[in-house]
Amino acid sequence: MRKNERKTRNLKLKVINARGLHARASAKFASTVDRFRSTVEVSRGGLVVPGNSIMGLLTLAAEMGTVLSIKITGDDANEVGVALTDLVSDFFGEGQ
């Protein structure tokens, strides 16, 4: 990788918790993104929002079963991807 080149990671995450990406889950998602330096964009159906924006995430209206496309750009892109995958896999800490 060149000195000024930034890593980009793309992934798809399926919302598996019963309440979907509601306010508390969106806050946890945004908080997770804020722990890192990378830029995160989340998209659904052509709508793209910043991963650290609770209001933006809410506009995606992601119900259970929705697949979100995530684009992560930055030196710690892999770490962000792991953290977000873990968060979603853990039902946003809500136990389903």
What are these regions (language model features)?
Residues 1-8, 96:
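SAM-dependent methyltransferases
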Residues 6-12, 67-69:
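Intrinsic-disorder/low-complexity, polar/charged segments enriched in Ser/Thr/Lys/Arg/Asp/Glu/Gln
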Residues 10-12, 59, 86:
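Acidic/proline-rich low-complexity IDRs
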Residues 14-63, 72:
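Compact, glycine-rich, soluble single-domain proteins
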Residues 63-96:
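C-terminal structural segments of small proteins and small subunits
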